[in-house]
Amino acid sequence: MKIIIAPAKIMKLDRDSFPVQSTPEFLKKTRILEKFLKSRTRDQLETLWHASDKVVEQSLFQLKNMDLDTNLTPAILAFSGIQYQYMAPDLFTQPALDYIQKNLRILSGFYGMLRPFDGICPYRLELNTKMVGFRDYSLYHFWDEDIANSLFKEDQVVINLASKQYMRLVKPYLNSARRMITVDFQELKNDKWKTVGVHAKMARGEMVRFMAEKQIKNPADLRDFHDFDFQFVPEVSSDDHYIFRTDFDFTRH
């Protein structure tokens, strides 16, 4: 069983907490993207990144200093978004760390797919970037079926804790031998059950930690997850779509 999550836009360096253990599986393809980005002018990169001046400056600095082989940070520590903060991998026990290295995969527009202890460097390249001037019109086309093939090489089931944008790297390539279970976290807003992005990211991070601590191997055991008072709702769930709902007051958290 594999678990997929999305990366975070905010990245940091951390070479002290845990050592790098592995090399990204698709590093050869990442070098192609690196070469393309470094061949672009500042104006072309501004168009590509479509970001604020501050973010563009940071991204240019990252790109100028990019080295895919040295001074690397384990992927699980390199991303510092909400999901990763609530996952809190720096507090994991060794069995939990071993569990995520084996089972957790971080999807990425730049690296394709990462194990938690793959060594990476900071980058900016969102999956939905319009790749003007590149050999492929989109990163979905560039990565094609590579990621799905790798995910399902040893496992028939993938737990999807990624965003809709990133699950598109996998969903088109499902078949009768490939099962993906999407987990959805909902709250009651204006008398309708909705997914609130920030709170869903918090819950996804907590669920990864729950799975690692409990060494979850059976998807059905995910139903025992209750952080933020989330409860599995069988009446609205299906075999491939697990829905959790809560009335937790996030404003007091």
UniProtKB/Swiss-Prot annotation:
GO terms for cellular component: cytosol. Belongs to the UPF0246 family. GO terms for biological process: response to hydroperoxide. NCBIfam families: PRK02101.1-4. InterPro entries: YaaA. This is UPF0246 protein LBA1843. Pfam families: H2O2_YaaD.
